[in-house]
């Protein structure tokens, strides 16, 4: 990285490299903080990797995402990047298969039913593989950290911890997998009570309204597990409006490294935010560059998982010192290519200048 993080020096330009055309129907809204971060980083990576990248915005509407994906296929790019949020991947991949366009799954993986629908004999034609976040691990870390914070604060005098969970849209794998991680924590600790679990379509306003109702009904709640930062910010506002004190008598965790959430982590209102998975798209583009330059004809079937990193109060200041502003966009993403990247697909390795993450235990 230039200057700001001191991680990745600029590499010499790759001479004679053919430009690629890559397209993606993004499942998110243009206003989603996570997808804003992810798309900005993808555009930066595309510049470094000689890729012409087209991103169309699905606005969290399944029909729109599929229609956009098929339209992008009609433009005949060299590759399609496909996310399976809202179960949209199969029709887009099938459209790409009909035109012999390879696809790579990114951000949200196929389900078993999807694989059965796409399977043609022993393999899925023109599917290179997948690169997805380890959402279940993230959900576990969030759950354990939340319980630990409550116990350390002494807000569970009878030894029991009362939680509620604000999950994301159940039609997205990220929401389901993060909840799966939380449920692992609940099964392992019989002293934790999950009093309520609701799902919202990744909406801060909806998280605010649902949390307001839940805390009015169950004021004994001392922890709110939230599937992402936007939901945590909405839930925190609801708690504050009811006279609760986030970080003192009620605790919150989130995910995405949203700047506003990192403010809350820094001042103690949020226990932590996991993140770094906005880099998935950049890593995916590097994989496509490698796939093209190796002249592979058929799919490799590779499945890679990206481990998210913890941002807590001890680390957030250092993070902002080294990675603030457009620092992520100024990485040299040619370093993400196979053979150049020594860090694999772990965000933590990119954060080497930060203090070590303090996890609740070593099972994360």
Please give the residue ranges for each predicted region.
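N-terminal export signals
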Residues: 1-15
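Extracytoplasmic "Venus flytrap"
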Residues: 21-41, 45, 54-63, 71, ...
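Short, solvent-exposed amphipathic alpha-helices that sit
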Residues: 33-48, 138-145, 173-192, 210, ...
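Short beta-strand elements in bilobed, periplasmic/extracellular small-molecule ligand-binding domains
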Residues: 47-58, 165, 187-204
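Hydrophobic alpha-helical segments within soluble ligand-binding/sensing domains
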Residues: 65, 128-160, 207, 257, ...
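Hydrophobic alpha-helical
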Residues: 80, 84-99, 182, 196-261
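Flexible loop/hinge segments that line or gate small-molecule binding clefts
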Residues: 94-137, 261-262
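Hinge/cleft segment of the Venus flytrap/periplasmic-binding protein
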Residues: 166, 170, 283-364
